[in-house]
């Protein structure tokens, strides 16, 4: 039996912007995981979104520590627990706001799941930083512009160089 985890992007926080494919996968799931930190984890927001599509009762929170020293042990534990659900024949999904490939804990988690021969089926969501442009009718970049997406930084020299080099940041 193939072990599959569905990584589902929920979009920018509006249940009407959850893709039809994401909704179908979540409705068919037996358990839906969400990870996050202790302080802000998005649980209430995600629960509300899933309640709107009648899937909130399937949601299970998994702590993803901010502290890198503890993170790996938590990820290993999560992978082992996930495999137990999969071995019972359950359909397991993992949700993120926006898209699971951008500013998400899922890539780290999937690396560990892959060690257990778990196959990824990604259901991408509407990336959160594209939603405002769509809502306002503006483009993020024009034809010859250059766009940069950067990880968090507090290095003002780096920010200054990026702002000088790119039209949209």
Label every PLM stretch briefly:
Residues 98-165:
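Class I SAM-dependent methyltransferase SAM-binding "motif I" and its flanking Rossmann-like core
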């Amino acid at each position: 039996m193939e072990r599959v985890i569905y990584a589902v992007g929920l979009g920018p926080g509006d249940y009407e912007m959850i893709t039809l494919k994401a909704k179908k996968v979540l409705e068919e799931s037996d358990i839906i995981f969400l990870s996050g930190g202790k302080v802000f984890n998005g649980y209430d927001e995600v629960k509300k979104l899933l309640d709107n599509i009648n899937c909130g009762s399937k949601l299970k929170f998994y702590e993803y520590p901010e502290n890198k020293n503890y993170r790996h042990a938590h990820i290993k534990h999560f992978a082992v627990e996930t495999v137990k659900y999969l071995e019972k024949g359950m359909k397991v999904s993992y949700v993120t706001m926006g898209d699971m490939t951008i500013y998400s804990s899922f890539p780290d988690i999937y690396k560990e799941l892959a060690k257990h021969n778990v196959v990824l089926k990604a259901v991408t969501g509407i990336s959160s930083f594209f939603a405002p442009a769509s809502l306002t009718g503006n483009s993020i970049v024009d034809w010859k512009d250059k766009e940069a997406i950067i990880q968090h930084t507090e290095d003002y020299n780096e920010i200054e160089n990026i702002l000088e080099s790119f039209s949209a940041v």
